[in-house]
From Swiss-Prot:
Full protein name: Noelin-2
Keyword Protein biosynthesis: no
Organism: Homo sapiens (Human)
Glycosylation sites: 74, 155, 275, 310, 399, 441
Phenotype upon changing residue 86 to M: In a colorectal cancer sample; somatic mutation; no effect on secretion
Localization (cell): Secreted; Synapse; Membrane; Nucleus
Annotated keywords: Coiled coil, Cytoplasm, Disulfide bond, Glycoprotein, Membrane, Nucleus, Secreted, Signal, Synapse
Post-translational modifications reported in the UniProt record: N-glycosylated.
Gene name as annotated: OLFM2
Disulfide bonds: 195-377
Biological classification of the source: Eukaryota, Metazoa, Chordata, Craniata, Vertebrata
One Gene Ontology cellular component annotation held by this UniProt entry: synapse
Amino acid sequence: MWPLTVPPPLLLLLCSGLAGQTLFQNPEEGWQLYTSAQAPDGKCICTAVIPAQSTCSRDGRSRELRQLMEKVQNVSQSMEVLELRTYRDLQYVRGMETLMRSLDARLRAADGSLSAKSFQELKDRMTELLPLSSVLEQYKADTRTIVRLREEVRNLSGSLAAIQEEMGAYGYEDLQQRVMALEARLHACAQKLGCGKLTGVSNPITVRAMGSRFGSWMTDTMAPSADSRVWYMDGYYKGRRVLEFRTLGDFIKGQNFIQHLLPQPWAGTGHVVYNGSLFYNKYQSNVVVKYHFRSRSVLVQRSLPGAGYNNTFPYSWGGFSDMDFMVDESGLWAVYTTNQNAGNIVVSRLDPHTLEVMRSWDTGYPKRSAGEAFMICGVLYVTNSHLAGAKVYFAYFTNTSSYEYTDVPFHNQYSHISMLDYNPRERALYTWNNGHQVLYNVTLFHVISTSGDP
């Protein structure tokens, strides 16, 4: 167990944001994020488990690797000494080679001017030196081999160092670096959140007061973090004007926006922006419309079979809120009801490309008794009122087709909520409350396993 300043085996960290997800997907890395939840002051409490076998199980491999690296280092040093010696010898060999060539040239040039005796002496000397020529060539070849071997040893040493680093065989210093890296990753847990059960809603954050009593505002739930555009739709029926602000700051100041004029008017406030398109309910129909902002055109529209519309099955506040579209971590949803379901809330997964219903669930909860609803991680959360004193009262789990009654209060500051939607990118609830655009942070509690267990 690696010694820490907090009681092992848990490392607790406070990171600003919301509840977090597993930061290490590979259990071989050792560190695990076990739970995370949001504290009352809005900080994310991340709990990391440090396995006891962090280095002990690697001691044998680490020791063998260090011994191998020491051997390679010794060989490398010996190669450097040998190279230095052969370099000096090679200079002498090259001098001898030059001398032989000089003698051979002189012998050829003086063939006719030397006496027979002198010529024979030179010839005999050259004959003695000739066998040395092949020796010199072999010596030069061996020298080149030594140079190549030195490079191979150097490369091997670098590879072993990389392996050692990968195995984490640096003892205390290595673990210290790993802890620092872990802390950095844990501090980013708000940007790497996983799914969990809703256990709390923060105090409201009023972003702006703009527009009428009813409306909707949102950001793209699937845009990259650099894209902070805000869309604003005032009113709950027959509207066609959508304002697109460049950033949240521009929305607050009411500047730098463009206008989209929808070809067909909307009904209700249950719109959502998903992957560059607006999904909304066409006025006086049960038709879902997908409007693409960049091309300023309707890409597809489709009826929801049997879905009520035109205030047939609205939320408790009315406002043509028969159909409510939502996006969570798993995709696009529609919340509505039908005569066949006796006015109970139906949750359907929609294909975002074709708008076809992929699967539906009957929650058993009467829609007219619901103030608003939102989806988080495949769970539909329903409030019991749109007025003051409202709380998250009911949860339906699509993964198990089961439900439970909850008691999660939240502060309805302006006493009339007409839009409540969860943004999975920002892990926040967007609310239109009596002409005020409001944000809530949420607390998600979850237990995460990195060992492959569900």
